[in-house]
Design a protein with these regions (language model features):
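Rossmann-like adenosine-cofactor binding region
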Residues: 50-124
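Short, small-residue-biased leader/transition segments that mark boundaries at the very start
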Residues: 1-8
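Electropositive phosphate-/nucleotide-binding environments in soluble metabolic enzymes
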Residues: 20, 24, 58, 95, ...
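Adenosine-phosphate binding glycine-rich loop
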Residues: 106-108, 112-155
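Conserved short-loop catalytic and cofactor-binding motifs
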Residues: 14, 85-89, 135
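Predominant activation on well-ordered alpha-helical scaffold segments within soluble catalytic domains
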Residues: 27-31, 102, 144-149
Length: 155
């Protein structure tokens, strides 16, 4: 694994319980790379072990962000036991803000969009030069076009 190339998957607050599809697929793909991968979230929001893989799970968000090169914020509902599909915490301390970004390695901020501003991430972070959410969205368009082209070619 590369040194200092760290990607953090951060569970941010959200008013509704959202599925774990994006966090699970992101974790699965990150585990196939040579990046150090850390998942941070409040206790009770664990992802399925088969997707967490070799990722480090850190419940202290500030500790997880230390020295990170990329921050990818996303929200998801609880997975395990009687709490399945529930929102266990709406703690705004988990909103990605300058406070957390200051301890990173000048990390790039990512989110799959659309995003609830000032709930998932503050305006200061998403509007900063370190935010790459628009190029990220543009890449999704290209990826979808390529997949559609391949599907149509196979008909």
């Amino acid at each position: 694994r590369r040194q200092r190339q760290m990607c953090i998957r951060d569970r941010a607050p959200h008013p509704r319980p959202l599925p774990q599809a994006v966090p699970n697929s992101f974790a699965e793909w990150m585990n196939a790379t040579d990046y150090d991968f850390v998942i941070t979230h409040p206790e009770g929001y664990e992802l399925a072990p088969q997707f967490v893989g070799n990722a480090k799970v850190e419940y202290d968000q500030m500790k997880a962000f230390e020295g990170a090169d990329f921050i990818y914020a996303k929200n998801w509902a609880a997975y395990a036991g009687d709490n399945y599909g529930q929102i266990l915490s709406k703690d705004r301390e988990w909103t990605v803000s300058d406070r957390q970004m200051e301890v990173t390695n000048n990390a790039f901020f990512m989110h799959c969009l659309p995003v609830r501003r000032n709930m998932i991430v503050t305006d200061d972070v998403i509007e900063s030069p370190q935010s790459i959410v628009i190029p990220e969205a543009a890449n999704r368009e290209i990826s979808a076009t390529v997949v559609l082209k391949k599907l149509l070619e196979s008909l």
